Amino acid sequence: MAKKSMIERESKRAALVAKYATRRQALKAAIQKTKSFDERLVLQHQLQDLPVNSVPCRLHNRCTITGRPKGYYRDFGLSRHELRAMAHGCLLPGVTKASW
């Protein structure tokens, strides 16, 4: 089980990414469109003034049950441990053990 502080930190980052997504996208589009160097510098400064944690690449996928950051299956939103436990308990519809 991951520390609660790490899970909470990740959820705050996700909220910041969602909050600033449209503004960040608009600034990036404006930077691409502008031709003057001075205006581009001003727009880049505005982009840099946004919070650091509002960048989508700082998000990390975590298991919804345990908060484990590694061994994450994005189709289910679970770590490999919880995926295996839930599959054995028949809690995931359509998931069966492989047999050949």
UniProtKB/Swiss-Prot annotation:
Xref: SUPFAM superfamilies: Glucocorticoid receptor-like (DNA-binding domain)
Protein's name according to its UniProt entry: Small ribosomal subunit protein uS14c
Keywords: Chloroplast, Plastid, Ribonucleoprotein, Ribosomal protein, RNA-binding, rRNA-binding
A Gene Ontology cellular-component term: small ribosomal subunit
Record GO biological process: translation
Keyword Chloroplast: yes
An example Gene Ontology molecular-function term: structural constituent of ribosome
KW RNA-binding (keyword) present: yes
Subcellular location(s) of the protein: Plastid, Chloroplast
Quaternary organization: Part of the 30S ribosomal subunit.
Function noted in UniProt: Binds 16S rRNA, required for the assembly of 30S particles.
Originating species: Nephroselmis olivacea
Family label: Belongs to the universal ribosomal protein uS14 family.
Chief location: plastid
